[in-house]
């Protein structure tokens, strides 16, 4: 292949050729000889006859020989040596290189930068990466059977290839043996046997090529027959799975799928846990698919993309993508999807299938060592028996939990694997979000999931809905539980001496009463203070009557509120007033409210007539004089009050 070079005229047309020739003549002769040595070697190399010995590759690589003419190269060298031109660097060319063979550098150079960076960096989410030593999940039962069948097919193909190669070697050996049995070879053997005693001093070290060939030919068929005899019972032990032809509901193409009968513990054991024979229980139905392998793979990828898309959005259902109401944002699914999921899980549990994958609960996991062999089946049977015994023991120890699980063994193992992988990756076990760096090694669950777990009520608490939606609230906005609390000891009575006015305690008054009492006490008129004080006492008595009537109608409503009991003398006076001024005319029992740590709610406003208020006012004046006479010995005992 001729290489084209740039001529002097192509570089610059205004160059004086005479000046170039003078420059070349001025170069010393020794330098020219050194430059012309590699050119002479190339000419000698071209003059030699072409042969396969000169090339390491095949004949097809001989056409890429470099052909360099001395005239052009000399002119180019003169241009390089001149001062007015820039040297042109030739490519890194090696003469006997095989063209078309990809090099590591060329492959990396042809790749886009994104792919180069992806191959250089390790993908942390790949299950097969050795960097994080993550374990892959257990595939479903049908995929396990498919993998086992593929392995069996590969083994059978390799065995067939080995048999074919062995048969061809046997035929070649037969041909060689027929040649050895010819009369010429027999004469050679006889001559060799007669010639052997002459070398008796060498002993057994003598080399006999014909005898050695016969000995090898006899040993080879014996060695080939032994593995064939061992392979035949193995092929008989591996039964072929029945296949069915079905049509994919998505692409409308036909595909073959094996009929898989799940291995249940009832079929392996002669008797069930209930003592019934396995013949009475029908065998499990085979599992078939409506989609082909290609469409199922696409569906899994599509659902995975949808989950990633909805996971980033907050307040959106993971399944249908609709917005979740604000009151139910603690859930991941919307109400309709949660209801459908509950119904689906209930139907699966009723049919005795796994709630998560809808597979058989008693399906065994195939062992990796002995897949498709009878030994593996026996181990699976033993493992099923052990599982049944453990489940029976667990049911005897914990009868409330139930003997069987709602989730199959494969899903439980996969959940453990998923949690272990998330823990290795530094993510939360529940929501799979990245943990804070400060929580590495201390917590396996993120802060949000921990707070959600603390907020959720325990399972042992009964009547949780009543506690949540209870209408009983105090004035501070807190829910009250129906509990009785022992009251503290009663404080000293709030009665004053003769020169002090009577001040009722806050627990005996409502909000409106306190306002009226403060306004009347700040008025500054001493003559009006006593009637107003009596007015307050009369209003308080009537409010207490209504409060007692409401307690009879709703005894449970006021069980959580506190009201301190008044002194004995005031209780007697209140009983007399209640009997005399009861609205219904029926004597009521004295108020003995249950105790609690919070003050009572304000009673409803009163609606009093003018005549009724005048009667209470006149009666309060009469009672005030009696109270002063009765309180004199009491104040002698409590002089500070």
Curated annotation (Swiss-Prot):
UniProt key word Transcription: yes
Segments of skewed composition (Basic and acidic residues): 379-400
Residue spans, zinc finger dksA C4-type: 317-337
Compositionally biased spans, kind Polar residues: 13-27, 161-172, 193-204, 522-533
The protein's name: White-opaque regulator 3
Biased composition (Low complexity): 28-38, 151-160, 173-184, 216-242, 264-280, 569-579, 610-641
Biased composition (Pro residues): 486-495, 597-606
Keyword field: Metal-binding, Nucleus, Transcription, Transcription regulation, Zinc, Zinc-finger
Induction: Expression is induced in opaque cells and biofilm, and is regulated by WOR1.
Location relative to the cell: Nucleus
Disulfide bond positions: none
Protein purpose: Transcription factor that modulates the white-opaque switch.
Gene that specifies this protein: WOR3
């Amino acid at each position: 292949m001729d290489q084209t070079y740039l001529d002097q005229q192509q570089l610059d047309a205004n160059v004086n050729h005479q000046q170039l020739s003078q420059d070349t003549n001025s170069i010393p002769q020794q330098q020219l000889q050194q430059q012309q040595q590699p050119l002479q070697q190339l000419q000698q190399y071209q003059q030699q006859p072409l042969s396969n010995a000169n090339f390491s590759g095949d004949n097809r690589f001989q056409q890429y020989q470099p052909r360099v003419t001395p005239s052009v190269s000399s002119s180019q060298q003169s241009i390089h040596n001149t001062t007015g031109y820039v040297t042109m660097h030739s490519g890194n060319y090696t003469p006997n290189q095989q063209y078309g063979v990809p090099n590591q550098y060329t492959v990396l150079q042809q790749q886009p930068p994104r792919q180069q960076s992806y191959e250089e960096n390790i993908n942390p989410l790949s299950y097969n990466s050795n960097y994080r030593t993550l374990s892959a999940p257990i595939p479903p039962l049908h995929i396990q059977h498919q993998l086992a069948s593929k392995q069996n097919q590969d083994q059978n193909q390799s065995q067939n290839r080995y048999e074919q190669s062995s048969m061809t070697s046997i035929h070649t050996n037969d041909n060689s043996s027929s040649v050895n049995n010819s009369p010429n070879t027999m004469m050679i053997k006889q001559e060799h046997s007669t010639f052997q005693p002459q070398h008796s001093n060498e002993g057994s070290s003598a080399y006999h090529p014909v005898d050695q060939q016969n000995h090898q030919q006899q040993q080879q068929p014996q060695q080939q027959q032994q593995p064939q005899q061992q392979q035949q019972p193995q092929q008989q032990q591996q039964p072929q799975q029945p296949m069915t032809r079905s049509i994919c509901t998505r692409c409308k193409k036909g595909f073959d799928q094996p009929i898989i009968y799940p291995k249940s513990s009832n079929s392996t054991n002669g008797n069930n846990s209930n003592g019934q024979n396995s013949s009475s229980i029908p065998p499990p139905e085979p599992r078939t698919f409506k989609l082909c392998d290609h469409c199922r793979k696409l569906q899994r990828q599509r659902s995975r993309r949808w989950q990633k898309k909805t996971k980033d959005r907050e307040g959106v259902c993971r399944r249908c993508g609709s917005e979740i109401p604000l009151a139910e944002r603690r859930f991941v699914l919307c109400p309709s999807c949660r209801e459908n999921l509950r119904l689906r899980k209930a139907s699966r549990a009723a049919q005795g299938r796994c709630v998560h994958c809808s597979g058989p609960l008693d399906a065994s996991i195939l062992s990796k060592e002995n897949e498709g062999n009878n030994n593996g089946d026996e181990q699976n049977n033993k493992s099923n028996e052990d599982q049944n015994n453990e489940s029976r023991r667990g049911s005897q120890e914990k009868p409330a939990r139930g003997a069987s699980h709602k989730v199959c063994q494969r899903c439980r193992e996969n959940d453990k694997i998923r949690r272990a992988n998330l823990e290795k990756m530094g993510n939360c076990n529940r929501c799979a979000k990245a943990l804070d760096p400060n929580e590495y090694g201390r917590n396996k669950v993120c802060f949000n999931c921990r707070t959600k777990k603390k907020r959720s009520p325990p399972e042992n608490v009964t009547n949780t809905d009543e506690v949540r939606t209870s209408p009983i609230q105090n004035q501070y906005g807190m829910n009250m539980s129906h509990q009785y609390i022992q009251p503290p000891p009663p404080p000293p009575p709030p009665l004053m001496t003769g020169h002090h006015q009577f001040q009722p305690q806050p627990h005996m008054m409502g909000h409106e009463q306190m306002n009226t009492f403060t306004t009347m006490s700040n008025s500054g008129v001493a003559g009006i203070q006593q009637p107003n004080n009596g007015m307050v006492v009369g209003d308080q008595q009537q409010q207490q009557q209504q409060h007692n009537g409401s307690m009879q109608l709703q005894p449970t409503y006021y069980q959580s509120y506190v009201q301190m009991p008044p002194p004995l003398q005031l209780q007697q006076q209140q009983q007399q007033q209640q009997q005399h001024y009861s609205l219904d005319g029926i004597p009521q029992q004295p108020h003995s409210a249950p105790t609690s740590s919070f003050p009572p709610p304000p009673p409803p406003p009163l609606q009093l007539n003018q005549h009724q208020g005048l009667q209470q006012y006149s009666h309060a004046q009469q009672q005030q004089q009696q109270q002063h006479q009765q309180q004199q010995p009491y104040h002698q005992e409590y002089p500070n009050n």
